[in-house]
Amino acid sequence: MKKGLLCAVCAWLFPIVNGMAQTQRSMTVDQLFNLIESGSNVLTAQKTGVDVASRAVEEAKSKRLPDINASLSASYNGNVLMTDRNYSNAKGFSQPHFGNSFALEAQQVVYAGGAINSGIRLAELQKQRSENSVQMTRNQMRFVALGQYLELMKLSNGIKVYDSNITLTTKLIDDIKSRQKQGMALKNDVTRYELQMESLRLGKRRLEDQKSIINHQLCNTLGLADVSIEPDIDLEAISDNLDSEQLLQTEAANLSPVLQQSSIDVKMAEQQLKLSKSELLPKIAVVAADNFAGPFTYDIPPIDKNFNIWYIGVGVKYSLSSLFKANKSIRRAKEQLRLSNTVHSVAAETVNNNMQQAYTMHKQSFVELRTQQKSVELAQQNYQVVNNRYLNQLALITDMIDASNIKLNAELQEVNARINIAYTYYNVRYAAGNI
């Protein structure tokens, strides 16, 4: 019996000792966001993607530069064999055996049907898309981490509510035991409140375990280890004096990364259409070349001299196959543009709906808080009345338990309502795209 009791006490004390061993760290919302920025591998990878996109822009712009090629060669030339067309009357001629050649070629594209400019613009838009993806991920990670952060605060406050009710119930049990000794209460009354106490302790333990789980998940998100995060946020500073819904809708339309992403996709589809149409246009370039070589082998016998040939001119190139191939890529590009415009319209509608919902829920959260505060006030009054009646033997123990449960539930709901104000406020900022 004693051994079992000792094991039970150790099991109950272990999470407390373990929690005490864990380092506590007070954290504001700004500190939370800074840790996400510095500790997120996902954000680091996406920022690297922006650097890659920047290099792609430089690469696309380099296509405006001239193409210059140089070649240098030395060779051993064999003697010449010449025959008639029927392969008879063969004759041999000696020629200089050492050959050399140096060639220099340059080409500058002056018109490519807009293909080069469209390629550069596509690369720039891809860079913007990468930067916007970083912002989208940053907002998402901040909002998810903030939800865990506020959940920790909610659980911590809930544990305090349980502690308060456990203290109150302990005092009540002592009072009932005292009355039992005086013959004014039954053993069953004590038993019922001891059961109530066990229920309170179990409820508190559940909140503590849930807090441990959320804390572990948040630490992983922030790149922290073995730290007990204590939220530090002034809930009273959050008011319902937001801008009007219309101003917030305008802000969301201008700042929402979701809308910006779909807008960039539309612009990329437009450039892709221009790129496809450029296949139907000619390509014009200025060309120049110089060739210094020897010996001169275009005469018989060959002349053992070096000679130099150069030219400069304009080259025009047109792909005749584009007349029956380019139309397919153009049709595909047009369909992609239409799809991108549709997706952008859907995204705008979604952002508008999300902002309206977030704004309405934030306003509603203050109504809920006032309602829950009134409920707590009434529940506490009811508890005091029932407690006084019970002490005067005018109420049953079941009435006391009901009043205690109503009071506990009201206090927990008030805690949830107060935290919900902060959550709905940041949800408005998230919907606007600037959390």
What are the roles of these predicted feature ranges?
Residues 20-69, 73, 79, 225-226, ...:
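Bacterial Sec-pathway N-terminal export signals of envelope proteins
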Residues 3, 27-31, 55, 138-253, ...:
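Periplasmic alpha-helical coiled-coil/stalk elements that build and connect Gram-negative outer-membrane
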Residues 199-224, 376-434:
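Short segments within alpha-helical structural elements
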Residues 22-25, 71-108, 235-242, 274, ...:
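Small/polar, glycine/serine/threonine/aspartate-rich low-complexity segments that form flexible
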Residues 1-33, 421, 435:
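Bacterial Sec-dependent N-terminal signal peptides
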Residues 247-293:
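Acidic, glycine-rich loop-and-beta core segments that form the ion-binding/anion-interacting portion
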Residues 42-48, 61-62, 96, 110-138, ...:
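Sec/SRP-type N-terminal targeting helices
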